[in-house]
Amino acid sequence: MEDPAGNSKRRSLHRLFASGTRPRWLAAGLTALLAALVAIGCPVSGIAGSPPAAEPRRPFGIAGVAEGMVEPLSPPSSPAPSSQSPPPPAGDERPPLPSPPIWEGNGDEIAPVRFGDDPLHGDESTTATVRIGGLVQLDDTAYAASAGPMQPIDQAGLAPPLSDAVNFRRARLRVDGRRGDQFDWATEYDFANQINAKNQIDPLFPSQGPLPAVTDLWLRMSDVPLLGAVRVGNQKDPFGYEHLSSCRTLDFMERSFCQDAFVGPFNDGFVPGISARNGTADGLLGWEAGEFANTAAPFGFSDFAGGSMTSGRVVWVPTYEDDGRRLLHIGLAGRTMQPRNGLVRFRSRGGLWNGPPGPDNAIYADSGVLSGSWQNMLGAELVASAGPWSMQAEYFGSWLYDAATTDIGPLSTAGWQPPPGTPVGTVFYQGGYVETTYFLTGESRTYSLLEHRFDRPQPRHILALSPHRTRGFGAWQAAARYNYLCLNDTQVNGGLLNGMTLGLNWLLTPNARIVFNYDLTHREYRSTPWANSPSGPVPVPSYNGSGTIHGFGSRLAFDF
């Protein structure tokens, strides 16, 4: 019997694929086409956003991708519609899909990707989910300054000098997931934001950077009696609201001076240790505490020469309305630690950086390397929001006990201080910032009662210029910040910084933004009157490097 029309072509294709000689370009082309269709949001059979099949099957594959961009698959809830089923809704209307599952992560980066349930037991407690994501931040910065900061390095000028640059600020790849309803894990590496250097100024290996280094690398167990969620591994310790907020959602290109001087000065804010987090059932009161290694490099998890560090944070949310669109948050945090190798260096870069940390970024204030027996820190947080307006402020204080000056490093880059080896007692440094933001397009920020920080902003209309889509221009956010750092205390004076940063953020989608910053910093700084020589420290003139520094920056940032 003769084949119906078209059957001969289908059989030819079947023979092509069954013969083992199918061309590689065909598979590659189909993969590229599928990826392109998913990226632009076109409905693809079996992918979120397509109409349900006539005979729904248990999903095995991608259940959701970038947060806010693609809807999750609808789980099959009924058999295939029969001829007696009611007709589908008219036009393009479809019944609402269920909300994506709640997923606890370090920065709400992406929604889960399901690889399948346990095929043997069918038990939800053994369901495994995995997420794959990353982020890229590309910066362009330019600077200008008055005479003082532009003096030579050995005459109290900025060290290193200012330099314009186009560079990657961060480039990370991340894989995290959950096993059952109690265990979750994360691993993330940054390929652009690390320099292999010691606290003592000089690099361990010259010209070694940027280097890939771990940020998140931890395992967490939830629902532990009394302790709540217990996390073990490389992580952020619970100290500081700005510190615990994801770099994906920062209001400015850089965090405050205090983040650089106190919170995460040389380890990028990630330290190895164990922590526990718990709170009331409604989330309005929460606490977190942990024990960590006091590292001085992003590679410190493999170096046991450091001291111990205990950190804790308590948060109270007296006002929480409309998912945090009206909010008042009050927090208090503390650290107590043994200085690594008995040495501490307080320093801060500016409100704009010209790429990854290390020898390319100018140091605005610097105490030099001090010795000490113990260090305590205190932090206070105040966060509020009302509709499109929000604000946050923090204060930090640091006490270094039994401090003394040292001759470690090039003394010419340190601030004014007595001769090396001079005991100076307790050194107290402090700083803080206050910032405010306003959505010009009317959006409001929501707040996570689980992690006690703002969620990722969601534009009302993502950027869409295609005539086949609903026209949208994203969200626009204006921001302003006052920034303060004082590294002056009695005998050891590393400098005083007062800064103002203005920002304009264009949120193209929930996962992509363009950031514009102008930073103005006034620096009060005098160099130390000592220099190293073969015979020991010798007196030299002290220079005045005070002045004003202007910075202009822009960033293209996206994560997936």
Where do the language-model regions lie?
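N-terminal secretory signal peptides that target proteins for export/translocation
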Residues: 1-22
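N-terminal periplasmic/intermembrane-space "pro-region" immediately following the signal or transit peptide
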Residues: 2, 38-153, 202-205, 444-466, ...
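Sensor of tandemly repeated, compositionally biased sequence architecture
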Residues: 9, 21-22, 29, 77-85
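Intrinsically disordered and other compositionally biased segments
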Residues: 11-16, 25, 35, 51, ...
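Short, aromatic- and cysteine-enriched interfacial helices/patches
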Residues: 13-17, 47, 60-63, 120, ...
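Sec-dependent N-terminal signal peptides
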Residues: 20-47
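Outer-membrane beta-barrel pore domains
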Residues: 97-104, 144-145, 159-160, 204-207, ...
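Outer membrane beta-barrel
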Residues: 117-148, 158-340, 428-470, 477-490
